[in-house]
Curated annotation (Swiss-Prot):
Descriptive protein name: Phosphoprotein
Gene of this entry: P/V
Biased composition (Polar residues): 279-300
Swiss-Prot/TrEMBL keywords: Phosphoprotein, Viral RNA replication
Family membership noted in the UniProt record: Belongs to the morbillivirus P protein family.
Region named Interaction with the nucleocapsid (N-RNA): 459-507
Source species of the chain: Measles virus (strain IP-3-Ca) (MeV)
InterPro entries in alphabetical order: P/V_Pprotein_paramyxoviral, Paramyxo_P/V_N, RNA_pol_Pprot-P_XD_paramyxovir
């Protein structure tokens, strides 16, 4: 299959060079255009059939039209077909009746030969195109055996000009060319030829252009391709390849600029989006020679043509880190909520502690003002209990022993009082206090803890002012009472004012 394709390509290149050296005349091109227009208007006549004559001993095989073109007044009208195209895609083209062998503008047709040099019959392939040429001016191009078998046109029926297809003889054929006889040409030469021909293109557009695929790169061949055997009903077998569809991340790569100028009308490109640096997973398909390339080998071979997924992995790491931070924040928020609940309890505990501190301070103040009697102090040396050693761990507390520390304030010693108590049949520790230690009676005309008695001194006026300020009387009345207090001079008037003030407050 590869040898046949190489042979067809070489034959096509030879045709292109021949056409470049000896271009077809404008008259022949005009007649060919007219015939092609008629065929386009009648699709039923687009494909014609041609059966191989078994009676002939010449062993004529089906010719292959590799290229048709012109450099005079128009671009070449050539269609190259690969092994992946079907027989239904072959184009037909009509030519006028001319002595193509004698004329320099004739078509050069080639036959397929095997390695022994003999013409191969029955070649059924997408690349094989038959050329039928008769004495009239509407010669047509048809496909291979498969196309002739599937054609709806009867072989014996006349065409549009009234000639039967079977009556036509084969076109004048030049000597056969082998694969070794044709000089190979690089793809750059083909593109250069197309560019030179497209510059002087003034020929009307027929809607057919030369599609020359770039030469396959053997270094890009992948081991993942699966050969598919395809029968051709001939001596050779066509081996295609199963093209795998791969998923690669990254943007679609920009296509290289074609060296040939477009032959058709231009299209507006104002709304074309710009290239992106990254995109979602896209399918990759490589039609060249039916080979596929893995993304890893492409990255190594092209050196960064395909976008690396390092940025995608970094984004995933950032997302994971953000999710972890969010989770930690939720934990911190839950702990803060629990702390807010404990805050109220802590405040209540602080209040209770403050109250206890106030109570302790009050008790300390009261204890500091109390005189504690020390055991053994004030005892009579003649008392038998005076020599008794007192436990040092015992602390003096008031009321523990009512008989202690009373010798200094009683009229009689403790021993005499005990003996007198025993004689009376009862024990008593009471004694009469000395007069200097006895409290004086409370005077009714003097201020004491029992009640306040105002006098003409400044202390009495200060006490009355404090009573007025701490009362719940209105402010206007307080100011009025302060004014009256300043005007009072005598003790009796001050006492009456105090009585009146207490009545107002009690109301």
């Amino acid at each position: 299959m590869a040898e046949e394709q190489a042979r067809h390509v070489k034959n096509g290149l030879e045709c292109i060079r021949a056409l470049k050296a000896e271009p077809i005349g404008s008259l022949a091109i005009g007649e060919a255009m007219a015939a092609w227009s008629e065929i386009s208007d009648n699709p039923g006549q687009e494909q014609a059939t041609c059966k191989e004559e078994e009676a002939g001993a010449s062993g004529l095989s089906k010719p292959c039209l590799s290229a048709i073109g012109s450099t005079e007044g128009g671009a070449p009208r050539i269609r190259g077909q690969g092994s992946g195209e079907s027989d239904d895609d072959t184009e037909t083209l009509g030519f006028p009746s001319r002595n193509l062998q004698a004329s320099s503008t004739g078509l050069q047709c080639y036959y397929v030969y095997d390695h022994s040099g003999e013409a191969v019959k029955g070649i059924q392939d997408a690349d094989s195109i038959m050329v039928q040429s008769g004495l009239d001016g509407d010669s047509t191009l048809s496909g291979g055996d498969n196309e002739s078998e599937n054609s709806d046109v009867d072989i014996g029926e006349p065409d549009t000009e009234g000639y039967a297809i079977t009556d036509r003889g084969p076109a004048p054929i030049s000597m056969g060319f082998r694969a070794s006889d044709v000089e190979t040409a690089e793809g750059g030469e083909i593109h250069e030829l197309l560019r030179l021909q497209s510059r002087g293109n003034n020929f009307p557009k027929l809607g057919k252009t030369l599609n020359v695929p770039p030469p396959p790169d053997p270094g890009r061949a992948s081991t993942s391709e699966t050969p598919i055997k395809k029968g051709t009903d001939a001596r050779l077998a066509s081996f295609g390849t199963e093209i795998a569809s791969l998923l690669t991340d990254g943007a679609t790569q920009c296509a290289r600029k074609s060296p040939s100028e477009p032959s058709g009308p231009g299209a507006p490109a104002g709304n074309v989006p710009e290239c992106v640096s990254n995109a979602a997973l896209t399918q990759e398909w490589t039609p060249e020679s039916g080979t596929t390339i893995s993304p890893r080998s492409q990255n190594k071979g092209k050196g960064g043509d395909y976008y690396d997924d390092e940025l995608f992995s970094d984004v995933q790491d950032i997302k994971t880190a953000l999710a972890k931070i969010h989770e930690d924040n939720q934990k911190v928020i839950s702990k803060l909520e629990s702390l807010l609940l404990l805050k109220g309890e802590v405040e209540s505990i602080k209040k209770q502690i403050n109250k206890q501190n106030i109570s302790i301070s009050t008790l300390e103040g009261h204890l500091s003002s109390i005189m504690i009697a020390i055991p053994g102090l004030g005892k009579d040396p003649n008392d038998p209990t005076a020599d008794v050693e007192i436990n040092p761990d015992l602390k003096p507390i008031i009321g523990r022993d009512s008989g202690r520390a009373l010798a200094e304030v009683l009229k009689k010693p403790v021993a005499s009082r005990q003996l007198q108590g025993m004689t009376n049949g009862r024990t008593s520790s009471r004694g009469q206090l000395l007069k200097e230690f006895q409290l004086k009676p409370i005077g009714k005309k003097m201020s004491s803890a029992v009640g306040f008695v105002p006098d003409t001194g400044p202390a009495s006026r200060s006490v009355i002012r404090s009573i007025i300020k701490s009362s719940r009387i209105e402010e206007d009345r307080k100011r009025y009472l302060m004014t009256l207090l300043d005007d009072i001079k005598g003790a009796n008037d001050l006492a009456k004012f105090h009585q009146m003030l207490m009545k107002i407050i009690m109301k």
